[in-house]
Amino acid sequence: MKHIRISLFLCLLFILNAFHVFAQSSGASQTENYFGLLKNKRVAVVANPTSVVGKAHLVDTLITSGIQVVKIFAPEHGFRGEAGNGDHVSNGFDKKTKLPIFSLYGSHTRPTPEMLSNVDVIVFDIQDVGVRFYTFLATMQEVMEAAVISKKEIIVLDRPNPNGYYIDGPVMTDPKLYSFVGQLPIPIVHGCTLGELAKMINGEGWLSGKKSCELTVIPCSAYTHNSYFELPIKPSPNLPNMTSIYAYPSLCLFEGTCISIGRGTNLPFQQFGFPNCKRGETSFTPKEIPGVSTNPPFENQLCKGIKVSFEERPTQMNLSWLMTMYSSYPNKEKFFSSPGFFDKLAGNSLLRKQIAKGISEDEIRATWQKDLNSYKVIRQKYLLYPDFN
């Protein structure tokens, strides 16, 4: 009887959790809250494969509802997700709608005044993962800059943040390191949705000249920062599941090192290591995968290392992975293969130096706290949803 009660409890817990996940709804799904704002206007849409309303793409939904969509802007990986990590995204036309597509991840990272000359309002709808160096945040910031320059409205259709239940990592404090993987004074795991960050960017004067754009955010429904949210569509080619999304804040720092994080395998951002690694029990051989991974580290070489798994959602970045790989790698001088890029990901040059000096994790984290506390005060002003505990 005891086992039956436990089983019933677990079933009930599963049903309640499933209902909560199902009940959450993106800003894009709240069509009654923004269709009226688009009526009789020429609309540009910043979107990718995650931009869905139910099972239909946002662009298709707008067109079938009589909204005049005149063009599409595509972020990293492209409008239909056809480009790999870091690959140049080209201009073109969408085969289904015949609409022109302008790349925001190539020769231009923001719409030009010419591109916006026949546009009244920009709609931004992209799923983010809540990490500073995920480039969709920089794309949104650049679109906001363009909206200021061209005096256009921007509507952000908000989406839940799967990593929005905690805040961690160093705050980006050195403007000299600003790049497309980080150009805001926020921590690596910022605990905000893109809608909240858009309000923060506007409110804190982080756009050029401390100007602000004409911004409307359409919030999600039934979402809190404690909510569990499982992404229905992978946000980018190398983040195929929730394990990779939870590991991403920690493992992406390895992109500035020589360590493989599983790019070119069936478990990207779910395993890491190098040839002849003495730590961990997993093994993998990175290979080129068209549209997903080009020239991955240690291509066609057998790597050994650690496979990532989570019994529960992580509540902080895992610095021990980075420290373990550094201590295990035989040639310390070559570990940080791209030190400048590592610093851009970290937001400062201090973390790299701390790892090299063997500073403890507690000591490293202590150096983050002052800036984190200041950020948390700013963040509270722009929250659209109940916060995590």
PLM regions: where:
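Bacterial Sec-dependent N-terminal signal peptides
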Residues: M1-S26
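Short internal beta-strands
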Residues: V70-H77, L157
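Glycine-rich, charge-decorated loop segments at or immediately adjacent to ligand/cofactor-binding or catalytic sites
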Residues: G81-G86, I155-Y178
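Glycine/threonine-rich flexible loop motifs
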Residues: D128-M140
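Conserved anion/nucleotide-ligand pocket segment
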Residues: L177-Y248
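Glycine-rich, aromatic-lined ligand/substrate-binding cores of catalytic
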Residues: S221-E299
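Conserved functional hotspot residues or short segments at active or partner-binding sites
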Residues: P268, F272-Q369, D387
